[in-house]
From Swiss-Prot:
Belongs to the CTU2/NCS2 family. HAMAP family: CTU2. This is Cytoplasmic tRNA 2-thiolation protein 2. Its main location: cytoplasm. Plays a central role in 2-thiolation of mcm(5)S(2)U at tRNA wobble positions of tRNA(Lys), tRNA(Glu) and tRNA(Gln). May act by forming a heterodimer with NCS6 that ligates sulfur from thiocarboxylated URM1 onto the uridine of tRNAs at wobble position. Prior mcm(5) tRNA modification by the elongator complex is required for 2-thiolation. May also be involved in protein urmylation. It is found in: Cytoplasm.
Length: 485
């Protein structure tokens, strides 16, 4: 008897006991169809997690609570927003939503309980053509039957600054770590940096860059949901992604935001209490999502993402043992946390689920005594204690006195160099500080954003004023179809 059979030939699916196994996950062997069902059921369970979400996703009929017309309107108005990044998670989540719509249409004779609007955010025009091409392929290959139920929208997040009615300059005072805000409406003396790229260019490290980009993207998505009356935003975050988010928030000094960021029960109060946020993939590991993505052919639509083949019986990556050459110094905090969870995901996946469950159990922090809860002018998170007071208490601001002639000479050189810079600049950090001290007003930044602002080249950033005018300023979108070029 020949021993030349591949490993997959001798492995049978433990669910159906018929087909060859293509995935091994949680110590169980799955064929492709059974694994798709396994992942799909976990997502659908989250979609039915409480009455609010059941009313969105179920097909409604006339009953004791609603008339036939009311049921029809509820089905029609059950709109959900799906952010698509073209990573594996958001593609898989959308694929399962598409399957759900197809099943509802067949079972309920053309009726469905909800519609899907997909939002794709970008700030780099170079990637725009690739996005359009992928969307066109997706519609034709995957979503042709649901082209009236699934719509794709492209949003340029540079509008974050372009369409903001009021801009402010947030400036960090180095001596006391207080934040001052300068209204730029009538301050033509200060250059307005209106594009996102200009703001991101001020970031001194990749962590700050990614944090700001993530916030602007999330704000654009939630603002779009607010303006178009969506019932819920479905975020394609895996259990692994949520775990690394929890750890990263703690490391960045944003631990107080964990409770609100994982909250799926309450309406989003920063956006008019109009919608809720749901994480349908929160019970699924990233490696499981990647396996689903590959076996379903969704890997052909990925942008800037590499599939992990850890759970696949037949590996797809030839250099699985290749050592990553990226320096730890060049990694963001989120990337470091993600790398850790990727390493332990195989043998210690319970650690990941424990982190997410613990984050879910965290309640909103209590405010510091005699401190009125406020909101951060930058990230909009609640502030429960005065960060500047705490930073000042642990910081030594007085320098060592100059003693030797060499120290005095070096100090004079430094002073002359900076004076020359001051003369050649219309409004650099030193002048801006003095100007803001006299003309600015006190602003509120959380601890995490205070630390972030400290990494900026001039300790300041131009930022929109988050108010009703900004929230209602129209966010333009471009509807993508199956014949985009």
């Amino acid at each position: 008897m020949s021993d030349s059979h591949s490993h997959s030939d001798i492995l049978l699916c433990q669910r159906c006991n018929k087909n060859h196994a293509s995935v091994i996950s949680r110590k169980e062997k799955f064929c492709t169809d059974c694994f798709r069902n396994f992942v799909s059921l976990k997502q659908r369970k989250q979609m039915m997690s409480d009455q609010y979400y059941q009313d969105i996703f179920k097909v409604m009929y006339k009953d004791k609570l609603r008339s036939e017309q009311d049921a029809h309107l509820q089905n029609l108005n059950s709109k959900i927003l799906v952010p698509l990044s073209f990573g594996s998670s958001s593609l898989v989540m959308l694929d399962i939503l598409n399957d759900t719509l197809l099943e509802q249409s067949i079972t309920h004779r053309g009726k469905t309980g909800f519609t899907v609007d997909v939002i794709i955010c970008f700030h780099d025009e170079q990637i725009q053509n690739q996005i359009k091409e992928n969307v066109s392929k997706l519609i034709n290959a995957k979503y042709k039957e649901n082209n009236q139920k699934i719509k794709f929208h492209l949003v340029d997040i540079n509008q974050f600054f372009d369409n903001s009615p009021h801009l402010q300059s947030l400036v960090l005072q180095e001596t006391d770590f207080l934040i001052k805000s300068l209204n730029l409406k009538d301050q033509s003396i200060i250059e307005k940096k209106l594009t996102l790229s200009e703001i991101l260019d001020q970031c001194s490290d990749r962590s700050t860059y990614q944090d700001l980009l993530a916030f602007v993207t999330k704000h654009a998505i939630k603002k779009y949901a607010f303006q178009h009356d969506f019932k819920a935003i479905l975020w394609g975050h895996s259990m692994t992604r949520l775990a690394d988010e929890v750890i990263s928030l703690i490391v960045k000094g944003r631990g107080s935001a964990i409770s609100s960021s994982l909250n799926t029960d309450d309406f989003d109060e920063n956006y008019g209490n109009k919608f809720k946020n749901l994480y349908p993939l929160k019970d699924i590991l990233l490696t499981e999502i990647d396996a689903y993505c590959y076996n379903s052919g969704l890997h052909n639509y990925l942008i800037n993402y590499n599939i992990q083949d850890a759970l696949l019986v037949n590996k797809i990556n030839q250099n699985t043992d290749k050592i990553q050459t990226n320096s730890l110094k060049n990694k963001t905090i989120n990337e470091l946390a993600r790398n850790y969870f990727e390493v332990i995901e195989g043998d210690y996946s319970n650690v990941i689920s424990t982190v997410v469950r613990t984050g879910d159990k965290l309640a909103e922090p209590k405010s510091q005594e005699n401190f009125k809860i406020s909101k951060c002018n930058l990230c909009m998170q609640k502030i429960y204690s005065d960060p500047s007071q705490w930073i000042t208490s642990i910081t030594e601001n007085k320098g060592h006195p100059l003693e030797t002639d060499e120290e005095k000479e070096n100090y004079q050189r430094w002073k002359n160099y900076n004076n020359d810079k001051l003369k050649n600049s219309e409004m650099d950090f030193f002048r801006l500080n003095e100007f803001v001290k006299e003309n600015g007003s006190k602003a509120c930044l959380c601890y995490g954003c205070t630390i972030t602002l400290n990494t900026f080249k001039d300790k300041s950033v131009v930022w929109p004023v988050h108010d009703d005018k900004e929230l209602n300023s129209v966010l333009e979108d471009y509807v993508l179809t199956d014949h985009e070029e």
